[in-house]
Curated annotation (Swiss-Prot):
NCBIfam families per record: PRK12346.1, talAB
Protein species of origin: Pseudomonas aeruginosa (strain LESB58)
Pathway: Carbohydrate degradation; pentose phosphate pathway; D-glyceraldehyde 3-phosphate and beta-D-fructose 6-phosphate from D-ribose 5-phosphate and D-xylulose 5-phosphate (non-oxidative stage): step 2/3
Protein name (record): Transaldolase
Subcellular location: Cytoplasm
GO function terms (MF aspect): transaldolase activity
Job of this protein: Transaldolase is important for the balance of metabolites in the pentose-phosphate pathway.
Active site per UniProt: 125 (schiff-base intermediate with substrate)
Top EC class, one word: transferase
Length: 307
C-alpha cells in the first residue's frame, strides 16, 4: 500500500512549511513556504552561512535589506529543488501600513528578479489585516501574486476572496490551540475548530466560484491533515511530512465542495467589527504578528552583528 503522503498528493497539492533545503529535497513537495521564524532557524544551519555573509555584505548596513536578501537567497535555493512556488514574507512590522507593504513586496520581487527568478514562481506573504489585504489587491493587479497568511477568521477569508488574492493560508493548529486552552478540552477529527474553520472557508469559496487557492497551514497532528485531505493545498512541517511518508493505511478524501454560504462583501467597518467580535481571531492575529516581528528583529540583529 502507498504511504499516506502519496495518497494525500492524489487529492491535494503538498507544500513544505520550512526553510530547510535538505528536508525539502528529501520530501519532494510541489511548493514551499517560509516566514521570519523559519528563516531564523535556517540562519543557524551551516549550509546557509555563505548566504548570510553575502546578504550582509551587499546591504550597506541596512539590516532590513540584509534580511530580504537572505530570504531571497534561501528562496532561490529552494526553487532549485521544487517545481512550484516559494512564499516569501513581508516584514510583519508593516502589517498595518499598505504603502510600506507594497514597497517591501516590490523590493522582494526586484531581488528575485536580480537572481533570475521569474515572479511567477514567487508568492509574497502578507498578514491578513485590512491594510495587508488592500496591499495584496493592488499587487495582484500588478501581476504579483500573494499569499495572505495569519488567517484565523471567516471575515478575513471573505475579504481576501473579494480582493482577488491568489492564495490564503488559514491556520488550523493555532485555532485548535486557542480553543483547547480556552475550553480546557481536546478536539479530534471533524470537531476540531481549526478543521471546521478551513472546511467552512473552502466550501464558501467553491460554492461562490472564487479562484483564490485555500492552503491549510499550521498543523499539530496527522488527524488535522487527514480531515482536510482534498483541500487545494496544505503546507506541512517536515516532521509531519515524514510521519505521513511513514504511515500506512487508507487516507480517503474527506474535504469536498458542498453547500456554502451566500457570497458576501465586507466594507472596512464591517470587517473590523467582525474581527472584534471574534476573540480567537483577534488574539491569534495580534500574537502571530508579534511573533513574526520578534523573529524578524532577531534575524536583523544577527545579520547586523556579523563579523
Amino acid at each position: 500500500m502507498t504511504s499516506k503522503l502519496e495518497q494525500l498528493k492524489q487529492y491535494t497539492t503538498v507544500v513544505a512549511d520550512t526553510g530547510d533545503f535538505d528536508a525539502i529535497a528529501r520530501l519532494k513537495p510541489v511548493d514551499a513556504t517560509t516566514n521570519p521564524s523559519l528563516l531564523l532557524k535556517a540562519a543557524a544551519l551551516p549550509r546557509y552561512a555563505e548566504h548570510l555573509r553575502q546578504a550582509t555584505a551587499g546591504s550597506g548596513g541596512d539590516a532590513g535589506l540584509a534580511c530580504d536578501r537572505f530570504a531571497v537567497a534561501v528562496g532561490k535555493d529552494i526553487l532549485g529543488v521544487i517545481p512550484g512556488r516559494i512564499s516569501t514574507e513581508v516584514d510583519a512590522r508593516l502589517s498595518f501600513d499598505s504603502e510600506a507593504t507594497l514597497a517591501r513586496a516590490h523590493r522582494l520581487i526586484e531581488l528575485y528578479d536580480e537572481q533570475g527568478i521569474d515572479r511567477e514562481r514567487v508568492l509574497i506573504k502578507i498578514a491578513s489585516t485590512w491594510e495587508g489585504i488592500r496591499a495584496a489587491e493592488i499587487l495582484e493587479r500588478e501581476g504579483i501574486q500573494t499569499n495572505l497568511t495569519l488567517l484565523f477568521s471567516f471575515a478575513q477569508a471573505v475579504a481576501c476572496a473579494d480582493a482577488g488574492v491568489f492564495l490564503i493560508s488559514p491556520f488550523v493548529g493555532r485555532i485548535y490551540d486557542w480553543y483547547k486552552k480556552s475550553e480546557n478540552r481536546d478536539y479530534v477529527g471533524a470537531e476540531d475548530p481549526g478543521v471546521q474553520s478551513v472546511s467552512r472557508i473552502y466550501r464558501y469559496y467553491k460554492a461562490n466560484g472564487y479562484k483564490t487557492v485555500v492552503m491549510g497551514a499550521s498543523f499539530r497532528n496527522l488527524g488535522q491533515i487527514e480531515q482536510l485531505a482534498g483541500c487545494d493545498r496544505l503546507t506541512i512541517s517536515p516532521d509531519l511530512l515524514q510521519q505521513l511518508a511513514d504511515a500506512q493505511g487508507e487516507l480517503p478524501r474527506l474535504l469536498l465542495p458542498g453547500e456554502g454560504e451566500p457570497r458576501q462583501v465586507l466594507d472596512e467597518s464591517t470587517f473590523r467589527w467582525q474581527m472584534n467580535e471574534d476573540a480567537m481571531a483577534t488574539e491569534k492575529l495580534a500574537e502571530g504578528i508579534r511573533l513574526f516581528a520578534r523573529d524578524q528583529e532577531k534575524l536583523e540583529y544577527q545579520l547586523a552583528t556579523r563579523h
